C-alpha cells in the first residue's frame, strides 16, 4: 500500500520573510495520520493554527497567503511545493512571524530540511485526488486547467514582455513519472524585476528581497553574479509555485495541470472550482503500490 508520510524528527531553520523582511524561526514537526499540513503561529498566545487548504487562502498578491480570522501566514507556496514533491502528507509548520522564510528563493532548502529530518511512513493509506474531467478557469488571457492524466504532469507557459525573458525558454512540461521534482524543479528561484521594486516596496512588499534570495532582472540582464541555475529557471519556478499552490487541495494529485500566464490567484480559483464540481474528481488509495501511476522516493533515514 502507498502510505501516508510525515517527518521522522523535528527540524528547525531561520530566515527572513521575502515581503516582510522580518527574521523568522521555522520549525517542522511530525503530525498524526490525516492531519494534513498545518501552519502554526507560535508567536501568538494562544497559538493559532491554519490548515493548508484552498478555502483558507486570503491574499494572492505576489504570493499565497493563508488566513484564519485576522491571523495570516504569507508565502507558503515554496515550502508546500517541497512537501508535495517529497510526498509529505502530515506535518506541523511552526513560525515565529507571519511569513515563511524565503531561504534562497527556491524550494531546495526546504527539500534539504525535510530530507534531513527523515521521512516516516504511517499506518494509513495515502489519499490521492484523481482528476476525472477537464476543469478550466480563465481571466483575460490567463488560463489554468486540470485534465485527466495517469500520473502527475505540470505544463506551464509564461509570456513576459521583457527583453531578458524574451530570450529565455518560456514554456516547460514536467511529467513526474520520469522527472525528479528535487533535481528538475526544486532549485528554481523566484524572480523579480528592478522596474517593479520601487512600487513593491511602497506597498510593503519585497522588503526582504535581494540577489541572495531571488533572480533580479533589469533591462539588460540578470543581476545575480552567478546567473541562472538553468536556462528555463523562470518557467520552472512558476511550475514550482503551481505545485505548492495545488497542494492546498490537501492531497497529492493524479492528473495534469496546465497553466498559461497563471499565478497564485488563478491557481486558487481553479482549486475552488474543482472542489465545487464534485463530479470532476474522486479520492483514491492504492493497496498495491505497483499499480499506482505515481511513486515516491523511498523514505530516507535521518542524517
UniProtKB/Swiss-Prot annotation:
GO terms for biological process: lipid A biosynthetic process. It comes from the Bacteria. The active site is at 264 (proton donor). Zn(2+) binds at residues 78, 237, 241. Pathway: Glycolipid biosynthesis; lipid IV(A) biosynthesis; lipid IV(A) from (3R)-3-hydroxytetradecanoyl-[acyl-carrier-protein] and UDP-N-acetyl-alpha-D-glucosamine: step 2/6. Its cofactor is Zn(2+). GO terms for cellular component: membrane. GO terms for molecular function: metal ion binding; UDP-3-O-acyl-N-acetylglucosamine deacetylase activity. Belongs to the LpxC family. This is UDP-3-O-acyl-N-acetylglucosamine deacetylase. The gene is lpxC.
Amino acid at each position: 500500500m502507498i502510505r501516508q508520510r510525515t517527518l521522522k524528527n523535528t527540524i528547525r531553520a531561520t530566515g527572513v520573510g521575502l515581503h516582510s523582511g522580518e527574521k523568522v524561526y521555522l520549525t517542522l514537526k511530525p503530525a498524526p495520520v490525516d492531519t494534513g499540513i498545518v501552519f502554526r503561529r507560535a508567536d501568538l498566545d494562544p497559538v493559532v493554527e491554519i490548515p493548508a487548504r484552498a478555502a483558507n487562502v486570503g491574499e494572492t498578491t505576489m504570493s499565497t497567503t493563508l488566513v484564519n480570522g485576522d491571523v495570516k501566514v504569507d508565502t507558503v507556496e515554496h515550502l508546500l511545493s517541497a512537501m508535495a514533491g517529497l510526498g509529505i502528507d502530515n506535518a506541523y509548520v511552526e513560525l515565529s512571524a507571519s511569513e515563511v522564510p524565503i531561504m534562497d528563493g527556491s524550494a531546495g532548502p526546504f527539500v534539504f530540511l525535510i530530507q534531513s529530518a527523515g521521512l516516516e511512513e504511517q499506518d494509513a493509506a495515502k489519499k490521492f485526488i484523481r482528476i476525472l474531467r477537464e476543469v478550466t478557469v480563465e481571466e483575460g488571457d490567463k488560463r489554468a486547467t486540470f485534465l485527466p492524466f495517469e500520473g502527475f504532469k505540470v505544463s506551464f507557459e509564461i509570456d513576459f514582455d521583457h527583453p531578458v525573458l524574451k530570450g529565455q525558454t518560456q514554456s516547460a512540461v514536467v511529467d513526474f513519472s520520469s522527472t525528479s521534482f528535487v533535481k528538475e524543479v526544486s532549485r528554481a528561484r523566484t524572480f523579480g524585476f528592478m522596474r517593479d521594486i520601487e512600487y513593491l516596496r511602497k506597498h510593503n512588499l519585497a522588503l526582504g528581497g535581494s540577489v541572495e534570495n531571488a533572480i533580479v532582472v533589469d533591462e539588460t540582464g540578470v543581476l545575480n553574479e552567478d546567473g541562472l541555475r538553468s536556462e528555463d529557471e523562470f518557467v520552472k519556478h512558476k511550475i514550482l509555485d503551481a505545485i505548492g499552490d495545488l497542494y492546498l487541495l490537501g492531497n497529492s494529485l493524479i492528473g495534469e495541470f496546465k497553466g498559461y500566464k497563471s499565478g497564485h490567484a488563478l491557481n486558487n480559483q481553479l482549486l475552488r472550482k474543482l472542489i465545487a464540481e464534485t463530479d470532476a474528481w474522486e479520492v483514491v488509495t492504492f493497496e498495491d503500490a505497483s499499480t499506482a501511476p505515481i511513486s515516491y522516493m523511498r523514505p530516507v533515514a535521518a542524517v
